[in-house]
Swiss-Prot record:
Organism lineage string: Bacteria, Pseudomonadati, Pseudomonadota, Gammaproteobacteria, Enterobacterales
Keywords on record: 2Fe-2S, Electron transport, FAD, Flavoprotein, Iron, Iron-sulfur, Metal-binding, NAD, Oxidoreductase, Transport
Keyword Isomerase in annotation: no
Disulfide bonds: none
CDD domains: fer2 (cd00207), FNR_iron_sulfur_binding_1 (cd06215)
Species per Swiss-Prot/TrEMBL record: Escherichia coli (strain K12)
InterPro entries: 2Fe-2S_ferredoxin-like_sf, 2Fe-2S_ferredoxin-type, Beta-grasp_dom_sf, Cbr1-like_FAD-bd_dom, FAD-bd_FR_type, FNR_nucleotide-bd, MRET, OxRdtase_FAD/NAD-bd
Protein known as: NADH oxidoreductase HCR
Domain 2Fe-2S ferredoxin-type positions: 237-322
All copies of domain FAD-binding FR-type, residue ranges: 7-107
EC number of this enzyme: 1.-.-.-
Gene Ontology molecular function terms on file: 2 iron, 2 sulfur cluster binding; flavin adenine dinucleotide binding; metal ion binding; oxidoreductase activity; oxidoreductase activity, acting on NAD(P)H
UniProt: [2Fe-2S] cluster binding residues: 273, 278, 281, 311
Amino acid sequence: MTMPTNQCPWRMQVHHITQETPDVWTISLICHDYYPYRAGQYALVSVRNSAETLRAYTISSTPGVSEYITLTVRRIDDGVGSQWLTRDVKRGDYLWLSDAMGEFTCDDKAEDKFLLLAAGCGVTPIMSMRRWLAKNRPQADVRVIYNVRTPQDVIFADEWRNYPVTLVAENNVTEGFIAGRLTRELLAGVPDLASRTVMTCGPAPYMDWVEQEVKALGVTRFFKEKFFTPVAEAATSGLKFTKLQPAREFYAPVGTTLLEALESNNVPVVAACRAGVCGCCKTKVVSGEYTVSSTMTLTDAEIAEGYVLACSCHPQGDLVLA
């Protein structure tokens, strides 16, 4: 089997697939070579073993603890990658993965007091790190608060019995769950909150709220992982974008990233991590004003030529694209 793209050089075989919740599955993979990764990182997956379609998924397993490399995936109605992984991929199939990526990890944090906050599928890197801390920092004081819609939506439900965890459910609450959502009162009740390293993963509004609240409560060590946002509808006014090849003009609202502008107008672009790390969305800007929040993977020569990472490019005016 030929490697579909140099970005995904790791071939892994599906050993088994486990359904976690009504819409989430864990795919357990065998890698016949040593695959280096850190708890909390993610990898790109070549969807249908193609070079054009790559998607980023958290590696939900834990190095030095888990028997398999695992990806835990929520099926999304229009998700190209998630539909393929949860409907079509079967035991014995092969997947191609990239090197592990991302800095959302706990192994470089020197402190031994953690508060891990997760919502929905954002629990995947949290569980990876929770296992790692139990194995490598058994002395660490680790608190976990996990928010779900219903008790049936708890991912890794059996495994959470091994660790102290506060479960919060919005609906259909049963014994062992707190009803509602995460509140400031719940956060304030965490012992020694201000001295903890707080790490969170989940939908963007959830993480933004968490950041605001924990910082107001005195937390200084705060880290969050980005989850992806849906593609917006195409705009008819705002910033103007002129693409030279093929020739076309389109618009996007002020404040959007270049990637959001491209995707909302159905301009072909490969995007995987959406966090300025993987380099998939490299795009050349011919003219126009913009700022960038990441240039990882770009060489000095590429930057000088006008290349940007579309996910990390913030147009300040009209742009002309190659």
